[in-house]
């Protein structure tokens, strides 16, 4: 049996774990961080940074991550890292990206969007001016989002305020809400583009990957193949930036709809102007009107009640 040993830094260890996630083993030898078991190769990563490849495909698998030093391929070998950072390997792939909007806004829903960008369309989508939606004005969002939606397959899930408040009262933290919404949105898009399979699925990170999947333990369907949870993912792949823009576009549309319903232009965010708007709704429509347009557990609710009471 062929054995190959490579030395890995933390970045490479993370990349290895993500790449072989579907074959991770629960049985770990002493000193191991993780182990991978496939029919043709067993890979063991140790706390020391050593990674051992064993089996018929050991040379092939190790070669994906390292540059040969010219040693006898039949012997245990050391290799130098040549693998670029994970982010650089992902940016040119055909990928699904997902992002959410509305989690920090008192008024309005949470919107999760996912977009699929084929590698042949990356330049075209980027040329539309796609970047993190937080860097774009509302006017720019209304201009760019429809162009993205005409070009890239996408899926959207909206958690309205009434449902959000029910979930929150049941004890569900917002991080789990987001995990459920991302998973369901990804499932819709994966189905929509089938039989095409994305080479990667990139979630703008709000939880570490393990914590994200623990939130999905009770789901009947979990999208897990090739899923990466990465910070600032909108700068990793244009698909995430596209999803961010679509999510914000839908959020803005929902905010306009809610504003018409309550007869008041609802402000974004959770600052003092939001307290005043909520207090006005309470005075004009009653506190119960907030149930369908606001996230009631935010501190803004108490502040608005105090304002409405003393005016």
From Swiss-Prot:
Pfam families: DUF3378, RNase_HII. CDD domains: RNase_HII_bacteria_HIII_like, RNAse_HIII_N. InterPro entries: RNase_HII/HIII, RNase_HII/HIII_dom, RNase_HIII, RNase_HIII_N, RNaseH-like_sf, RNaseH_sf, TBP_dom_sf. Keywords: Cytoplasm, Endonuclease, Hydrolase, Magnesium, Metal-binding, Nuclease. Manganese or magnesium. Binds 1 divalent metal ion per monomer in the absence of substrate. May bind a second metal ion after substrate binding. Its EC number is 3.1.26.4. GO terms for biological process: DNA replication, removal of RNA primer; mismatch repair. Its main location: cytoplasm. PROSITE patterns: RNASE_H_2 (PS51975). GO terms for cellular component: cytoplasm; ribonuclease H2 complex. A divalent metal cation binds at residues 99-100, 204. The keyword Cell inner membrane does not apply. Residues 93-310 form the RNase H type-2 domain. It is found in: Cytoplasm. Belongs to the RNase HII family. RnhC subfamily. Endonuclease that specifically degrades the RNA of RNA-DNA hybrids. This is Ribonuclease HIII.
